[in-house]
Swiss-Prot record:
Residues in coiled coil: none
The protein, known as: Glutamate--tRNA ligase 1
Catalytic activity of the protein: tRNA(Glu) + L-glutamate + ATP = L-glutamyl-tRNA(Glu) + AMP + diphosphate
Organism encoding this protein: Caldanaerobacter subterraneus subsp. tengcongensis (strain DSM 15242 / JCM 11007 / NBRC 100824 / MB4)
Main enzyme class: ligase
Amino acid sequence: MMSEVRVRFAPSPTGSLHIGGARTALFNWLFARHHGGKFILRVDDTDLERSTEESMRGILEGLQWLGIDWDEGPIYQSQRLDEYRKFANKLLEEGKAYYCFCTKEELEEMRKQAEREGRPFMYTGKCRNLTKEQIENYLKEGKKPVIRLKTPREGKTVVHDIIRGDVEFDNSTIDDFIIMKSDGMPTYNFATVVDDYQMGITHIIRAEEHLSNTPKQILIYEALGVPLPQFAHVSMVLAPDRTKLSKRHGATSVQEFRDQGYLPEAIVNYITLLGWAPLDGEEIFDVRKSIREFSLERVSKNPAVYDVQKLTWINGHYIRSYDLDKLTQAIIPFLQKKGLIGENYDYEYIKKIVSVVREREKTLVDIADAMTYYFKEVESYEEKGVQKYFTKEGVVDILKKAAETLKNLEPFNKFTAEEAYRKLVEELGISSSALFHPTRLAISGRTFGPGLFDIMEFLGKEKTVARIERAIKFIEENIKG
């Protein structure tokens, strides 16, 4: 039986939570929840110059919005510097690491020499065997050394990867790399190993780009004499053109998707599909199913291709099936941003409109756009609609009859309005589309949307008639008969 699973997500607060990072967090979280384990949030903030509180806040809010909760943390690396120094000193005392006093100029010369010899640059190990006396003299001179790990010159380091199988690295390609910088800060690889060991991390699930760091990290584990966790490197998320996903491919951060009106459940559903799928192959599923079925063995080795159209299609499904109150609450900030409502609004009225508008829309932004004419006067008419319906012979007379009919209608609701329109079609001897289409364009400015009589009921008699009369005026003034 597996001991308690402990996994972590360790973002650097130097940017936003993007789709790849969100997927890494999600896969760790699903794995922990599937096994009844712990999901730990750690913040890799040792790059003090680039780390910002704003970025950290955005990452935490993004995870919370997606429903990815953590059991421990956030734990900040910048608050653990004494721990890294303690472990580095242990390696120095045991002769597994050493002080290196090489200057920038000396390292540059080594780099040039490697270039001249046509080989990749590797640190030569110049300071590997300094005597105690030499070290003391350098320190007395005020030289600030880095600390390097003594790496084996021969043999191979093998990464046993749950997703990729065994990946071998030749030790001759790994130089004596730095574990502590001259300013006393740990390097990424060293801090990562110390943290993962002290936090009892059992499985490291992360992006494929970290695979090249793994042999160095294994060598640190071995030098410290502590057990290795299991590794699982998840393939990259590529853009549709199969290049690295970047801003030029549109929205890539969780915050951008949130601002564009995607629902958190839809994003979680979609990013779960980036390299994994449920047993039945379904594309729409909730997070409970993902937790039940998730396993690393079924994560694909092949790169996942990001497809915003598929995400939007999935989002449309969630928009249609979402709890109506939750959807209404989610849409309100978008309506406020568009200036359609203020701080005080008629919640029930908005909810009724959302119930009919959502059937055709795919994002909250789409819904807010589609709701515009319920709150504001129609400012323009779709050009294709004008050409198709407002230029037809007799349309002004038809709309005048419609306005007159609706003015005298009591009571006014979608059922009585439809009945009156059906009768008018018969009286005028025209097709229903000759009346319905220009009316829709007149009262909404659009050629499609919810049911025509639903719109009329929401607007009420006065607004409906006024908009038809305004359209008549527009046709008479702008369209030459």
